[in-house]
Amino acid sequence: MGAQLSLVVQASPSIAIFSYIDVLEEVHYVSQLNSSRFLKTCKALDPNGEIVIKVFIKPKDQYSLRPFLQRIRAQSFKLGQLPHVLNYSKLIETNRAGYMIRQHLKNNLYDRLSLRPYLQDIELKFIAFQLLNALKDIHNLNIVHGDIKTENILVTSWNWCILTDFAAFIKPVYLPEDNPGEFLFYFDTSKRRTCYLAPERFNSKLYQDGKSNNGRLTKEMDIFSLGCVIAEIFAEGRPIFNLSQLFKYKSNSYDVNREFLMEEMNSTDLRNLVLDMIQLDPSKRLSCDELLNKYRGIFFPDYFYTFIYDYFRNLVTMTTSTPISDNTCTNSTLEDNVKLLDETTEKIYRDFSQICHCLDFPLIKDGGEIGSDPPILESYKIEIEISRFLNTNLYFPQNYHLVLQQFTKVSEKIKSVKEECALLFISYLSHSIRSIVSTATKLKNLELLAVFAQFVSDENKIDRVVPYFVCCFEDSDQDVQALSLLTLIQVLTSVRKLNQLNENIFVDYLLPRLKRLLISNRQNTNYLRIVFANCLSDLAIIINRFQEFTFAQHCNDNSMDNNTEIMESSTKYSAKLIQSVEDLTVSFLTDNDTYVKMALLQNILPLCKFFGRERTNDIILSHLITYLNDKDPALRVSLIQTISGISILLGTVTLEQYILPLLIQTITDSEELVVISVLQSLKSLFKTGLIRKKYYIDISKTTSPLLLHPNNWIRQFTLMIIIEIINKLSKAEVYCILYPIIRPFFEFDVEFNFKSMISCCKQPVSRSVYNLLCSWSVRASKSLFWKKIITNHVDSFGNNRIEFITKNYSSKNYGFNKRDTKSSSSLKGIKTSSTVYSHDNKEIPLTAEDRNWIDKFHIIGLTEKDIWKIVALRGYVIRTARVMAANPDFPYNNSNYRPLVQNSPPNLNLTNIMPRNIFFDVEFAEESTSEGQDSNLENQQIYKYDESEKDSNKLNINGSKQLSTVMDINGSLIFKNKSIATTTSNLKNVFVQLEPTSYHMHSPNHGLKDNANVKPERKVVVSNSYEGDVESIEKFLSTFKILPPLRDYKEFGPIQEIVRSPNMGNLRGKLIATLMENEPNSITSSAVSPGETPYLITGSDQGVIKIWNLKEIIVGEVYSSSLTYDCSSTVTQITMIPNFDAFAVSSKDGQIIVLKVNHYQQESEVKFLNCECIRKINLKNFGKNEYAVRMRAFVNEEKSLLVALTNLSRVIIFDIRTLERLQIIENSPRHGAVSSICIDEECCVLILGTTRGIIDIWDIRFNVLIRSWSFGDHAPITHVEVCQFYGKNSVIVVGGSSKTFLTIWNFVKGHCQYAFINSDEQPSMEHFLPIEKGLEELNFCGIRSLNALSTISVSNDKILLTDEATSSIVMFSLNELSSSKAVISPSRFSDVFIPTQVTANLTMLLRKMKRTSTHSVDDSLYHHDIINSISTCEVDETPLLVACDNSGLIGIFQ
C-alpha cells in the first residue's frame, strides 16, 4: 500500500473508529481490539456471529484500494479450501476507508500459551506439526503469508491451529535497517517488540530503491518466521528474538543456540529443528516438506503422519463448508451447524477400534491376539474393570475387547500411551460436550472421555477430564448426570498420584458440586439419587486414598520440624471431608425413596470403614435398625443381607447389644424372603465365630421349629445354622444340650452333616396347613390351644419366652384349683373338648372351637399323628401372625397364598359391591341424527351380514322382544342395531338408549393435504348405558375407542360371500391368453378378486393400475383392460381387502390408497364403472423417504388391519377403517433388513424374514419379539407365507438355505417340518436345525440362491412358485408330495420329486431332472423375463393361473 505510508497516515483518526463501522450493513460494533496506526482492528457482530474487521483509513479521499483488494480477493479464494486458513470473507471499499472482514475466534496462540491447563509436550508437538503442514499447503498454492507470528495464529478450544491475516499484499516486503519506526508501524501491532521477520527483510538499499512493495516475498521468509513461533511455544511463551536481537543475529553477534535454545530446550532434536528453520542463509533453510520428512519418527511421532493429523483434519472438514465457485466464504449459519459436533462425536465413537489400532492402545480381539485385524462390522465391547460397579459395556462396530488399566502400567509398555497422545482426543471431546445436542451422543462422549482418560497421566486426568464431568452435573437430562457421576468416580479410581494444586480437590471443588447436584435433583425422579447412593462408598474409598497421598507427600517434602503443622492442617482437612461425606450419607439414609436406601446398602461396607467403628455406630447403624420396621420387605432384605458384614466391622459388643436381638425378632417377619435372609445372615455370623456360646441354645430353640416350615429355603438355612452350632460345640454339649432340642424334628439318629440330616428331617407341613394355622392364631377367641402362660422368663436377647397352657397346668390352676380366681375367671365359659400332644409329649387341652379347627386341618390333609407339628410351630406362628394381623392387606384365609417380596396390592373391600355391566352403542352420526327412523331400519337391514341377527326380533318368554345381539369389538360390547328399551327390577344392568355422549371423529385421510378425490370422513356416535353421575366413571367410559366393524362402512361396499379357494389340482399349464397392453412397462404387482365376478388387478412401474375382466378374456370377447387408475408413482404392492371389492395399493411416493371397484350387472354381463379412492395416507408423514414395499390385509369382526413393510425395515400396522396408525414394529438391524412379512390367521403373530437369513416371530398384541432363528447357510429370506394346510402354526419360508426351494416350519415349536430340495442330493439334517443363539455373530451369506424364486402363491394344499432363472412355474402338492411337478417349463427336462422321510418330524422332497422330449420347445408359449407376480383364481369352476412378468406381459394359463 506504499512504502512511505507511515508518513502520511494520521497519528489518530479525526473521528471515533465506530463511526467507520456504522456505515456497514447488518454489522454492529462491539469493541476495538488494538490501536495500531496502520490497520485498526475491531470486533463486531453480524447475523452469523462475531466477526473481526480490519479498517484501513484512507490518508486522502482519492486514495484507491481497488488493485490491492482484487489481489487479496483472489488470494482469499485460493485459501478458502484449506482447513488451516481463515481467509477474509468480505472486502469492502468506501470513500473513507477499506474493510477486510473475517470470522472472529476467541484465542490466538500467544494467549493460549498462558492459559490453563497448560499445553503438554505432545500438544505442542502437534501444534508445530500442524503449522508445518499448514505452511506446506499454503506454499503449494504459491502463496506466501508474510507476517507469521503467534498473534496471527488462531487456536480453537481443542488446539487446532488456523493461520490468518495474510500480509503479502498489505505490508511491505523490505524494511529499513536504520528506522525501527517502520517495523513498529507495520508489524509490531502488539507493542511487544518481538520480531518474527526474516533478517533479509531488513534491507535499507532495497527499501530506498522502492522495492519494499514491489519486491517478492519468499517461502524461506515464512520458514524463518514459523521457526521463531515454534521456538516460542516450546519456550513457554518467551520469544526467541526482539528487534535488537534480530539485528545482532543478522550481524553474527548473537549466538541463538547458546543464549536461547540451550537454556529453554532440553531436546536436541527440537533445537536442530529450530536451527534448520532460522538459518541466516535463506538457501540453507529447509522447506516444510523437508522438515517433516527429516524429523519423522525423530521429533514428530510416526502416528502424526499415518493417522492423527489426517483424522483431525477430516473432523475439521466435517464441521466447515467449502466455498462455492467465485466466493471466498459460505453462508453457513449457526442453525445449520447445530448438530455438527454430534456428528463428529459419533464418528469418533464408531472409529474407536481404528483409533486404538493406530495408536497401539491395548486392544484385544475377542478370541485373538493384540492388534489383530478387525473383522467385518459386528459388535465391539469395552469392559472397564477398574472399579466394582463400573463394569460398563461400550458397543462399537468392531468385535474387540479392551481391558483398561492404570496409566503407569500401560505407559511402561506402549510409547504412544507414555507420550499421552490421547490428550488430543480428550481436548476435542471435552470442549465439544457442552455443545452437543443429542442426549445419546452426549452419553457416548462421556464414555469416550472415560476410556481415553485411562491413557493419560493422573495429573491430566484431574486437570483435563474431571472438570468436564463435573460440568455435566448441570445438564438437564438425568442420564447424562448419572453417567457423568459414574465416569468421574471411575477416572478418580485409577488416580495414584496427586500434585500440590489438586490436594484439596474434594473439599474445595468436588464435594460442594456433588451436594449441589443432590439438592437440585430432590424434586426430580430418583434415578440419579439411586446411582449416587450406590457410588458413595466408592467415593469414600477415593477420598481416603487421596488423603493418604497428600499426607505422604507432605511428609516427604517437609522436614521433621514442620510435622506438627502438617498434622494440624491434615486434621482440619480430614474433619471437613468426613463432615461432607457424613452429610451426604445421612441424606441418603433418610431419603424417602426405598430404592435409594437399597442402593446405598448394596455397597455400604467401604463407607463404614471410612467412618470407623464409632462414627458408624452413631451415623449409620442408628438409621439402619429403623429399616427393619419399614413397610417395604425389599429394603428389609437388603439390610439383613448387609448386616453380617457390618457386624464384623463393628465387633461383638455392637452385635450382641443391637444387631443380634433385632435379627432374632425379624425371624418372625411376615415376608418369608426376609426370614430366609435373616437365617442366612445368622449362618454367616456363626461361621465367622462372632456369636458366643451363651446364645446358641436360645437361637436353636427359636429356629428349630422352622424345620417344619413349608418353605424349603427356610428349612435348609435352619439346618445349616444347626450344623454350624454343632461344629462350634463339644460332643458333650451337643448331646446334652442341643440334641434334646432338635431330636423331635428328625426321623432317626444320623450323622451331623447336612446331607444326612436333610434326608431324615420330618416332613414339613403343607402350605395350606401353614396358612390355616396362621388364620387360626388370629381368629381364635375361646381357645386353650393358643392360650399363653404369663411368665417373667426372658431369653438371652431380652425377649419374653412364650409358654402355652398344658393339661397339667390348666388342671392345677384353672380346672380344679380355686386359689387362682383371677385366672379362672379369664377362662369362664371355656370347656375342654379333647387334647392333643406336643412333640415333647405334653397334653394340650382343646375347646370345642379348637376341635373344629383341628377338624379343618384333617380335611386339608393333616393326619392325627402329625398334629404335633402345628403344636411345635405355635410359638413361631403366633408372633408371625400378629405381625400379619397388623397388615390389613395380608390374605389370611387364602390357602393358596404364596408370599412375595413386593407388597401386595391394596385390598379393597368389595364385599357388598356387585359388578355393573355397561353397554356401548355405536353408529354413524348421520344415521343417529336422521329424522326418519324407517330409513335407518332400511339401511340396517341392507347391511345385516351376521346370521345371528336374523333371530334378533324373536319374542322372549314374557312376550317382549329380545335385545339385539351383542358383539365384542376390541374388548368392548356394542350393539349392532337399536332395540326397544326394556325395564327390569335390576337397576344395575338396565340398558337405556341415551343421547350421544361423545363423538369419535375418525378421519380416513389422516395426514393428507389434498383429499379432493377421497371419500369424506364419517362421524361416529358412541353412547353407553351408564345412568350415574360419577365424573370419574364417565371420564373412564369416554376413553374407550369404539368403531363399527368394517362391513358397516358403506364406502367399502357390500360384503362378498365367502368364496372357496380354487382347486389347482386340475391345472394343466396350457396358455389360453396373452395380454400385452402393458408392454414394455414392467408389472410390479398383481392380485385377483375371488368374488362372483373375478377380475385381475395389475400395477406397473409407471404407476398405472389396470382392472381386467377375466371372464370376458377367457371367452375371447376382449383382450384389453376394463378400468385404469393412475397412481403417479411406481406401484410396489397390491393386496386385496378380504371379503370386499376393494384393494390397497402402495407406491414409491409413500402413498397407500384403498380403492373400491364399482361395477354392476347388466343382464348376463358385468360392467365396470370406475375405481373409487376411499382411503388414502402418506407414509412420508411418519418417516422421510419412506414407502411400503409389502402389505398384508386382515379383516374379521373384531379387527380390520393393514400391515405394511416399508423400505426402512419398519412394519407399520394401520386400521383399514380409518387408516389410523396403530403401532410400529422395528426389528433389530443386526438381524438384517426385513424383506418379507406375513401374519397368522388370528392376526396375533407377525412373521418376518430378513436379508441375513433370520426368521423373527413377533407377538403384535404386546409388540414383543418372542423368537428368532436361522438355519442352513443363512441365505436371504425372500418370501414367507402362512401354510394353513399343516396347521395354524406352520409357515412357508423361501430362503435361509441355498439348497432348497422352500421349507415349512412350525414357528411355535421352532422345528422344520418339510424341506423342498432343489437337487437330488440330500443335505445333512443339521442343515435344517434352528440356530437361535449368537445370531449377530453368524457369517451370513450375502448372495441369493442360484435357483432364486421371484414369487410364490399358496392355494389350499398347492404351493406355486416361479424360478427366476428359467421363468418356469413349479407346483408342489402338500396333500401328495410325489405328485409335485413343474406345470409351466420351457426346459426339455421335467422335474420328478421324490419324498424322503428323514426323521419323525422332518420330510425332504428331492428334485430329479428327467429328459422328456427331443423335440424343440415353442418359446412363444412361455415367459422370457422374470415373473414378478402370480395369482390363482377360478372362473366357472375352471382353475386359472395368471403370471405377470418384468416386460409387462400377462400370461393366463388353464
From Swiss-Prot:
Autophosphorylated. A lipid is attached at residue 2 (N-myristoyl glycine). It is a lipid-anchor. Transmembrane segments: none annotated. ATP binds at residues 33-41, 54. The keyword Transcription regulation does not apply. Serine/threonine-protein kinase required for cytoplasm to vacuole transport (Cvt) and autophagy as a part of the autophagy-specific VPS34 PI3-kinase complex I. This complex is essential to recruit the ATG8-phosphatidylinositol conjugate and the ATG12-ATG5 conjugate to the pre-autophagosomal structure. Is also involved in endosome-to-Golgi retrograde transport as part of the VPS34 PI3-kinase complex II. The WD region forms a seven-bladed propeller resembling that of typical G-beta subunits and is required to bind GPA1 and ATG14. Truncation of 30 residues from the C-terminus results in a temperature-conditional defect in protein sorting. Present with 279 molecules/cell in log phase SD medium. This is Serine/threonine-protein kinase VPS15. It comes from Saccharomyces cerevisiae (strain ATCC 204508 / S288c).
